[in-house]
Amino acid sequence: MSKLSLSSLDKSKLEGKKVLVRVDFNVPLNDSGQITDDTRIRAAIPTIKYLINNSAKVILAAHFGRPKGKVNEKMRLTPVAARLSDILEQKVNLTESCIGEEALAKSNSLNNGEVLLLENVRFYEEEEKNDLDFAKNLASHADMYVNDAFGAAHRAHASTQGVTKFLEPAVAGFLLEKELKYLQGAIDAPKRPLAAIVGGSKVSSKIGVLDSLLDKCDKIIIGGGMIFTFYKARGLDVGKSLVEEDKLELARNLEAKAKNKGVELLLPSDVLLANEFSPDAESKVSQIDAISGDWMGLDIGPQSIKVFQNALAECKTIIWNGPMGVFEFDKFAEGTNAIATTLADLSSFSEVCTIIGGGDSVAAVEKAGLAEKMSHISTGGGASLELLEGKTLPGVAALKDA
C-alpha cells in the first residue's frame, strides 16, 4: 500500500501552512522526570526540520504514557518540549491542553518556521475512542496533516486516524515513510534468501508473526524463552525453563507447517542453563535433550550460535524481532550479542539488508553499540509486529494514496 509522503509534496506549497504532525514522543523518564532515552524524539527531527526549513508553521501532537483520559501531572510533555528545544536549537512552546481556546490561540499566532507542541492528547478519553468531534477540534489547528508516529500507527485513534477526515492532504512523514519502505519492502519484495529471527519469552505474543512469516521466509530462527515450549511439545524434559503449557499443540503445528512449506525452521541444539533466575546464577551449557531437574534455560548455547551464524551468512534480507536469551543479565547475553554482531557485520561487509523490528531487540542492539551498522531500526514495537503479521495499520490506511 503506497502512500503519499511529505517528500512528494511541492515544497513551495508548505510556506505559511499550519501543519499538524503526529509524532511518537512516548519516551522513558527516570524518577526525577528526566528523559533517559531520546531516540524517539530524534527520529522525528528530519520531518520537523524539513517543515521549519520550508517556512511551515509546525504543530506537534503526541501522547505520553497511559493517563486513561484524565490530566496526570506526571505525564505532561514539559520535559519533551525542553529536550526538543535543545535539539532544534529554537524555542518550542507547549500548550496547556491539546484543544480549546488557549491551544488554538497559540497555534493561530505561530510565525513561519515556529514549532508548537500540543499537550498530551491522551489527557482526553476521546483520543483513544477516535471521537470525531475531538478529531475535528485537533484538526482545527492546521491546514494539513503529517503522520510521523510509526509507533502509534497501529492504533485507530483520533490523532492518527480521525483527523485525516478533516485535513487534506494527509501524508506520511519521513520516519513513517522509511519504516514502511523497509518493513513492508522486506515482506512484499525482499532480496532472497529472507530470514527472520524471532525471539522473546512467549510463543503467544509471536504467534501471528510466526504464522505470517512462514508464508514469506526461506529460514526462521527461533530463540529466547519460547524455544522451551517447542521442546516440551517434542516430548523433551526442559527442567524449570519457561513453558506455555496451553501452546504445545500450536508449537507442533508451527513445526509441521514449516516442514510442509519447505521453510527451514532452526531451533537451538544447545542452551545455557542457570540454577536460578538471577544475574549471578550458576550456569552450564547443555544439549537440549539433556536438561533436567531444577535447571532453567536462559540463553542459547555456543554450538547454536555457530549454526545460526552460518545460516544467516547465506541470506540477503534478515528481520530480527526478540532477543535470544535474558540479555539484561550479562552472563546470559552472549547469544543476543552474537546475533547483533553477526547482523552488523553482514550489513557492513556483505550488503545484507538487516531490519531490527522493534522492542527488546532494538534495546539489545543499542546496548551493544551496533545500532548505526544496521540497515534499519524500527521505532515501533506493536506496530512493527502487526506490519510483519501482514495486518493493515489504521494510521497508515487513513493517509492519502500515492
Swiss-Prot record:
One GO term (biological process): gluconeogenesis
Catalysed reactions, semicolon-separated: (2R)-3-phosphoglycerate + ATP = (2R)-3-phospho-glyceroyl phosphate + ADP
Cited Pfam families: PGK
PROSITE patterns: PGLYCERATE_KINASE (PS00111)
Pathway: Carbohydrate degradation; glycolysis; pyruvate from D-glyceraldehyde 3-phosphate: step 2/5
Signal sequence region: none
A GO MF label: ATP binding
EC number: 2.7.2.3
Protein name per Swiss-Prot or TrEMBL: Phosphoglycerate kinase
